[in-house]
Regions:
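Glycine-rich phosphate/diphosphate-binding loop of Rossmann-like nucleotide-binding domains
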Residues: 128-183
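N-terminal ligand-binding/catalytic initiation module
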Residues: 1-124
Length: 183
């Protein structure tokens, strides 16, 4: 619907309602169409590993939006993008679900869920899903530290990415006494 914006959906598995794909919608300035497609595939495969690890019942998927021709994540018409995403998810008829990822927001998901039910993003909840995701990471770290009798202040942590989730992880680690936290 808008020039300079392409939506790609990758699903790492069969397109079936019994085990639908799930992964967030990412909005970036990819140099090429191939780069966007490859990223979508790589991320969908990674999501399958996450879903298998936690036995969620989902396979991996990812929605990747490529901005080009002068478009950026800040200039994209969000309403039109959410309409396009909703149309694609509706066409896939429950075999792929999405939520927030890089450069998409809860407000975007609120708009998307008005048009399709295939959104997992804490809609209508007081829970900040970014904080909830970060806290699962912190809980895992604390569990491992407890199991192996490790002192967080003696460990070194590298947090990949310092966005909506990573920043909460990094701040929480420091708050828990970690002395060496890198982003």
């Amino acid at each position: 619907r808008q020039e300079g914006v392409q939506l790609f959906i990758a699903n790492d598995g069969k397109l079936e309602k019994s085990r639908p794909g799930n992964g967030g919608m990412r909005l970036l300035n990819y140099e090429t169409e191939r780069e966007a497609i490859d990223d979508a595939i790589r991320l969908a495969e990674g999501m399958t590993h996450k879903h298998n690890c936690y036995n969620t019942g989902f396979s991996g998927a990812k929605l990747v939006v490529r901005c080009s021709k002068g478009q950026t994540p800040k200039t994209v018409d969000r309403a039109a993008l959410m309409e396009d995403a909703a149309d694609a998810l509706e066409e896939l008829n429950g075999t792929v679900w999405t939520g927030c990822d890089i450069n998409t927001t809860a407000a975007d998901m609120d708009k998307l869920v008005e048009q399709t039910p295939y959104v997992l993003a804490g809609i209508g909840s007081q829970v900040d899903t970014n904080v909830a995701t970060a806290m699962t990471t912190i809980g895992s770290i604390l569990g491992v530290a407890d199991c192996y009798k490790l002192d967080l202040s003696e460990l070194t942590f590298l947090v990949q990415g310092c966005g909506k989730v990573g920043s909460v992880v990094a701040k929480s680690l420091v708050g828990l006494g970690a002395k060496r936290v890198y982003t």
